Amino acid sequence: MRLRMLILVALACALVAASDGQAQVQDTPFQVRYFANLQNGESLINITNTGANGAPLLGPGFGSDKNAGNICVNVYAFSPDEQLVSCCSCLVTPNAVVNLGVNRDLTSKTLTGVIPNSVVVKLLATRKSTGDTTSCSNSAADPTLVPVYGLVAWGTTLHAAVGGGFAITETQFAPATLSEGEKASIQGRCAAILGNGSGYGICASCRLGALGAEASRR
């Protein structure tokens, strides 16, 4: 009986350790977050590259490996009715941090011209299958690029506060499962925007640096 109890305890500990290990993996290739109440103020996205694919030995300014570990973070913004309203790509180097404004960069020039009050933003980290990634031009529509780990992102959004007004919250993007069907859909629809949108639906690329929460418009 004692041996049986010890085995059960050991098994339970192993399962807890395994689940904790899985929970700690946050830099998955595909991540999702929603942004709400956009007419009341800006929502912000901060993105970094954890270095999961390597990093320059002597830093980004010197050496033959100065482009090691770079990833493309491909951005897809969806309106509440499932329409892809904008897409774009950002080159993110290891240990760098870049930002996007949802109003400023993702919804200011949508494909349809309609500016939604809330969006779902999906991020997909990719890189070339061989060699270093030095450009992310049109990578959001490129099915040949390989999804990779190394992406971590946070976002702020506005929630109605008790007593009126809005409160700003910041949370990490949620790691998500990327099916082949979803990958083909978002990349194919982005390709249609790039090819036929006459510049509309192409969101502005990331800017260097992290941004804190901004005040809402009451």
Residue ranges: model-predicted function:
Residues 19-218:
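Gly/Pro-rich, tryptophan- and cysteine-flecked surface segments typical
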Residues 1-23:
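Sec-dependent, cleavable N-terminal signal peptides
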